[in-house]
Amino acid sequence: MDTQDMTAFPHRHLLGIEGLTATDVELILDLADGYVEQNRSPGRKSAILSGLTVVNLFFENSTRTRTSFELAAKRLGGDCINMSSDGSSVKKGESLIDTAMTLNAMHLDVLVVRHQESGAPLLLSSKVNCAVINAGDGAHEHPTQALLDALTIRRHKGTLRGLTVAICGDILHSRVARSNIHLLNIMGARVRVVAPPTLLPGAVDRLGVEVHHSMATGLKDADIVMMLRLQLERMQGQYLPSQREYFRFYGLDYDKLAVARPDALIMHPGPMNRGVEIDSLVADDIHRSVILEQVELGVAVRMACLDLLTRGHRGTGA
């Protein structure tokens, strides 16, 4: 893929959606669009990252995100190393900063970080010489997920501006929700959050969203219905009476979906809890569900991010 005519990215790191402009977002999405087509062609690999090293440093479990970043690096011709906390000296008591500085001494080019503590990627970005990408930090942000969601929506709807997007479920613990709220507001969408009061953060309305406690009102005439899983690993059991009761009121099925627009897209960042936040028939609806397309486009978005953040190492025409 030829990137010589692409604009330089004005940020050294990608730590969150907050702080990006609409121009920044469009730049990433436009570049990712090209990578979607490259990934669908027989010759998927290029040499844009040839000679560069990407390290995935994950302190939380991941299937989609880590594999997606690994594929993205390899399809751009880069070297990729996967590290987890279980396989590192963190298990022996080494601090996060010492781990990062040790990796930095080995002259890596991009550090992709997932950590259970909000702000960990920001801290690391001040200690290393390479680009840092936030792959999810606590309940703070998950920028590449919001970007791939935006690309999925744009490819179906043509634009994000003016769309009504309902984000439903465990908003309180969701970094995906926060990144999507920031991005959708930047791009001119109308954002609703739909959840029981116990699964909403305090002062959520200050984020520029409409707050709904009922799926009937929250999904009314929505263009996009984005479901979130219950993050039980971050709960202590006091947030909801039972998963069955939760599905009755907040699980997406065809009855609840009926109030949304007839062409509304169904989205989910994964992993899904079928029968808890979404019914299997809805999740697998080939006409309305774009859940697997989100996974596909995630690779292209992460390729675009790696491309843009390494241009200072190799020049924009590499």
From Swiss-Prot:
Pfam families: OTCace, OTCace_N. It comes from the Bacteria. Carbamoyl phosphate binds at residues 64-65, 114, 142, 145, 270-271. Disulfide bonds: none annotated. It is an enzyme of class 2 (transferase). PROSITE patterns: CARBAMOYLTRANSFERASE. Belongs to the aspartate/ornithine carbamoyltransferase superfamily. ATCase family. HAMAP family: Asp_carb_tr (MF_00001). This is Aspartate carbamoyltransferase catalytic subunit. It comes from Rhodospirillum centenum (strain ATCC 51521 / SW).
